[in-house]
Amino acid sequence: MKISTKYMTINYTEKDREYMKYLLDYLQRNEIIIVNFFKLSNFGEKVEITLHSNLDDFRKKYNEVYKRIPENWVCGFAYNNKYIETLSLSEYRKTKSHENVNIDNLCRLIIHEFIHSCHFKANSNSIYVRWLSEGLATTLSGQYDNIDNKFIFDATEEEMINGTTKYYNYYLMFK
């Protein structure tokens, strides 16, 4: 099945049908904020999002794109400025440390990946800087805004540059 917003096309399955209206409303409210943030007056092709209803298929796609096996916590990724791969809510809950995620977490995950796509579109001729891209995505998506935990920044400069730290460190750096 397929549904679209102004800037996205979402491919989903029957597994996702129960929350698609909520997801679509959320994405429509937030996509324009992100597009305006990056000043993308000429957006180009819509970003194509696939909600995978099978974790193994999602991991195969990741391996196909990045030529490596994903970590067991990976639940979404963006590539080529126009593709986003995420998991359906039930499959998202099967990844490490995501057992209790809800529809709001899925919405923020998709917006996080959409931010990457917009950042790449806005800076297509620039070198990819992980700490900047992840800092923007974790902060603008609000992924950590409603979490009660008191996070402490605990990453080295090398970990931030190489992307070998927890995502909350990128968030904390930008807050």
Model-assigned labels for residue ranges:
Residues K2-S117:
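Juxtacatalytic substrate-recognition/specificity segment
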Residues L24, Q28-E31, E134, T138, ...:
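Extracytoplasmic/secreted envelope proteins and their assembly/folding machinery
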Residues V35-K39, I115-S124, S141-N146, K175:
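Sec-exported extracytoplasmic/periplasmic mature domains
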Residues W73-F77, G135, Y170:
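Glycine-centered structural positions embedded in regular secondary structure
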Residues E99-I103, C107-R108, V129-R130, G163, ...:
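Short capping loops/turns at secondary-structure boundaries
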Residues A122-T164:
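Post-HExxH zinc-binding segment in Zn-dependent metallohydrolases
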Residues M160-K175:
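Pan-zinc metallopeptidase signature
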